[in-house]
Structure formats: C-alpha cells, structure tokens
Amino acid sequence: MAFNFNWSPLMADAGFYTRAQELLTAALNKSPKPPIIVDDIVVTELNLGSNPPELEILEIGDLAEDRFRGIFKMSYAGDAFLTLKTCVQANPLNTYLLTRHPFASPQPLAAATGLTIPLQITLSDIKLSGFVILVFSKQKGITVVFRNDPLESLKVSSTFDSIPFVRDYLQKEIEGQLRILFMDELPAIIHRLSLRLWGTEYSELETTSAQVTNPPLEGPGLDPLLNPPEDPVDASGNVLSTSEIASLSLDSGVEMHSLFSRKNVLRLAALTDSQRTLSLFTPSIQEVVFRAWTGLMEQADGPSGLVSPMSPPLSRTHSHVATSSLSLQDAASLASSSHSRLSLPSTGFSGYGLSMGAGRHSKAHARKRKKRVVDLRRRPKNTDDMESVSGESEFTESTSAASVFSGSTIPEENNDDPVTPPGSPPRTIRQPTLCDRIVARNGAERNARRGIPAEFGHDIPASRTTLPTANDIARMLATTSSLQQQLHPANSKSLPPQVPPQEPALRPSLTSNSPYPIEKPNASNYTSSGDSQQQQQQQQQHQTHLPSSLIMEAAQSGGILEQAWMMKMASEIARRIQDEKMGGEDAAGSSNNKNDNKNNNTGGFWEQSLMRSHTPPPAYRH
C-alpha cells in the first residue's frame, strides 16, 4: 500500500510555520540549559523542505472514515533546516570559577568577567529513522509516538566553526537536546497543531485563556491614596481643614500621601497602648510587650494546682495581690511552727485552701463563698483540766495560726482522712498525762527490772500502720526503773492491776516525730537476758535525764491503734510484774532475808527461763 503526501500545502501556509516556531521555542527553553548558554534559545527560521518522509506500514489496528491507528517505519533524509539564535559565554574559565571557592582561583586572570557573544546555529541534513505509532482522529487530532530514538545524524553550523573544540562542544550539546525533543516534546507539539487545525472548540478555548493571561491595558490605575480621607490629620495627629488640604494639593500631590484618617490613627494608637495583645489585665510596664498566653494561674487552676508565691502570674493583677497576702500569712505561720507535726498531705491541703480564692475570675464577678471553719483543735482551759484530760495538750495551737486559717476556705473532710491540721509551735513545758501517772505508779511498785516476755512481742494487731520500736520499749522501761528508784518504799504492798482508760480518738497522721529509727519488731527484741539487762542499765544511765512525759510519746505521736497497743502493753507488763511478785513472796515465805534476796536477784518464772538464753537479740548484734 502506498501513500501520497501533499507536502506543498504545509509549505504554503505561513501561519503554520509561525505557530510551529513558537512551540519549538517554548520546547527548547523548557529543559535546563548548560551554563555556557546565558540567553534564551529562539527559533528564527523553520523549513520542512520539499522531500516528504518515507513511511512503511507495519500494522494497522483501526481504520475508519474519521479515525486511523497504525504502526509505521519512518525514514527521512530531506532538505529541511532549522535556525536558532542565542547568546553564549565567551569565557568558560569564568563559568568554571563561579562554582569554586575564590581562594582556589588563579590570580590574576586574563579575563575576570565573562564576554557575552551572540550565537546563531543552523541545523541541516537531518536524518531520521525509527518506528512511529500514528493515531488520527478528527475529534482528538493526531498523536505521534516514537518507540525508539529516531535521530541518526545532523549538521550543526554556527559562528564558532573556526574553533574546533567549540564546534564539537555545540554539536554534542545540540544533538542531546534534539533527542530529548523528538522523544518528549515533538509528539506534544504535533498534537496541539492538529487540534488547532481540526478542533474549533480547542482554538476558541485557547484564545480565551490567552486573553485572561494577557489582559489588555486600559490605562494607568488610580492611586487610592491620592483621594483625601473624610477626616484627615497630619503626621502629628492634628486635624486639617479644607483650606489646608487645598493648599497642600495645590503645592504638590506628594503631600497627600502623608494624610491619614483620624479614626485609623486612634485605632492604631489604641492597639499600640494595649501592648500588642488582647489581654485586658496586663501590667503597665514601659517598653515591654506581653503576649496573650495562658498564665500560671490559669494553667494551675484546679484542686491539684499549687501557685507559688515567688512566681505570681501576670494575667490578673488584683488576684495576684490577694494571693500574695495570704501566702505571706501562711509563710509566717509555717515559720513559727517549724517543729510542729505537719505532714506532706497537710502541706498540700493548706496550699490548696489558699489558692481557692485566687482563681481566674476577678472578685467583682465572683460569688461570695461561705467561710466555714472546721476547727478540730482542742485548747486547754487551765492546768487542772490538762491534768484530767489525756492527750489534750497535743493539739494546742497559737492564736496567730488560728487567725490565718480562719480566713481561708477549708473543705470538710472525713475522719479517716490522714490529713492533719497545722501543728503548734514548740512547747517548753509539758504536763504529765494520766497515762504517765499510771505507768509511774505501776513502775514504783516493782522491786527489780523485769524483761518483757517473748510471747508479747507477737501480740501486735494486724491493722497497725507503724510498729513500735525496741528503743521505745527500752526507753519506757528505763524511765520506769528510774522512777522506781526514786519512789521505792521499804515495804510496799502490792496493788491490784489497773487498766488505764484509752485516750480519745485522735486524728491519725502518716508521719511520726520519733527521733529513733523504725526497727522491725522481733521476739528477741522484747526478751531480756543477762546481757540485755546490762545494756538496759547502760541505757538507763544515759537516759535518766529524760522527763517522765516521754514514756507515752510514741503512742501519742501515732494513731489510735498505736495508742491502744501501747496501753495494752503497759497494763500487761504491770499485771505480770504483780503476779510474779506475789508468786515470789508465797514461794519464799520461810525467811524475810531470803525473800529480799530473791526479790533483788531473781525475777520469778519468766526471768529464770530467760536467763538460760545467752544469745543476744538480733538488734544488738554487730
């Protein structure tokens, strides 16, 4: 099958060449150019020649009146030519030095600046050979796709043909650009040209887009600043009259740009005075700009938020003043009661109570809170009442501390809450309680020191929070023995054991102010032997200066369970001592001298059984 190409109509149409030159120019400048080319590449001449290409049909996929699809083998060796015009850099050394450090450049240079030379290149003797896929449709135009690189050879003629290395360089670069042109850009160019020829809708759409891209010039635009505002003012803020505006406009039109509206100036001044933020409660400090961020008071708002008096927030000044006054009173009360029994939860409680009234809202918009004060502290009326009521002096407080906490809101708490009220300042004189007098009276009736039986060491309630230490028991026994030496009569009669009443329920505390370390209770800690009696005598000599009020200090500093256990231990010890004393008198009724010796040397069944053990308790091992 043969084809007849009507090549002459393409050459006769002048508009076709013009559109083809524009498309080729855009395609050549689309890809990045080498650094030696410093100007755009412009297609000045285009001629397809008189010899058409040769096509060999390999396959026809679709054939109809308005569409065609086929695969061809194309070969072209005609007289078509193409002329390009651009500018090149005549100093390649300068182009090379632009990408290098100045320290590495040779000095001096023969030509430190580049010389731009116009270049004209003509491409001729183009030979093409390749496989082409051709698709034709009246609605979609012509689509040409090359399956391989069709460019075989071409001739490049330029103004630098007399310089061999420049000629070879241009030949190599232009061939590379043309290969990209045939594979990527030429099919798109042919498709757009075919749409212009057969598709009227595409031509109208392209014309409309060109008008939008390049709008026609309707004359110079109007300057809105040349029109004076309604209430003009000068640079100093003074209102200008109509005559002053007319005089300014007659002199020169430049002065009109310095006129501003009075409303705009006032708004700008208000914005400047507000320190560039929207917060209405910022401190008025000159030359300081505050941002409208969330302050510390808003971030720490809630039951767990504690505000430090050393870092007050900047958002609300009136709230900050109230917070500072309360914080100062709280600091004074804490300083006066540095040795009081304040635990960690109670400290957080007092801080939360003070921060309740310092919220985000001002006092003007806040509701009045009920100042309900739950006072759990007991104050002694006189010395006689203190002697009759046990444990009452533990919660005596100063008047200043009460005044501080009465001004803050204290929420109601359950009785099981381990939070304690603020402690009292240190006291120098402490009155003996009822428990102290009972223990002193029971200890005065004993003739010799008895050890604590081992079976009592395990009689500990399971619900106790803190265990009594061996040092507390030793200290109690040492104080009792010292009182027994002072108050021991010649012939004392045995008294029936008396169980002291328990103290009223006090509020438990998590911490204890005992100066002795907490030790794990063991049976051996409560047993006494020959070695333990010597060590207890040494402790007695060292602790004789302690007052009798320290006997029940560990019990009073603990909770209800600790006090009950200590009272039970004291009553059991007193009862056992009385039983042993009565048993020793009955067994040794033959002579009074032997009875005295037994009372002084032996301690009954418990101490005789404990004397057999010579192993020291684990608490005294080294």
From Swiss-Prot:
Annotated Basic and acidic residues bias: 373-384
Domain of life, per lineage: Eukaryota
Topology relative to the membrane: Multi-pass membrane protein
SMP-LTD domain residues: 1-195
Subcellular location: Mitochondrion outer membrane
Protein's job: Component of the ERMES/MDM complex, which serves as a molecular tether to connect the endoplasmic reticulum (ER) and mitochondria. Components of this complex are involved in the control of mitochondrial shape and protein biogenesis, and function in nonvesicular lipid trafficking between the ER and mitochondria. MDM34 is required for the interaction of the ER-resident membrane protein MMM1 and the outer mitochondrial membrane-resident beta-barrel protein MDM10.
Record's protein name: Mitochondrial distribution and morphology protein 34
Native species: Ajellomyces capsulatus (strain G186AR / H82 / ATCC MYA-2454 / RMSCC 2432) (Darling's disease fungus)
Regions of compositional bias (Polar residues) in chain numbering: 482-495, 522-532
Residue ranges of the region described as Disordered: 211-234, 303-322, 355-432, 445-464, 482-546, 581-622
Biological processes, Gene Ontology terms: mitochondrial genome maintenance; mitochondrion-endoplasmic reticulum membrane tethering; phospholipid transport
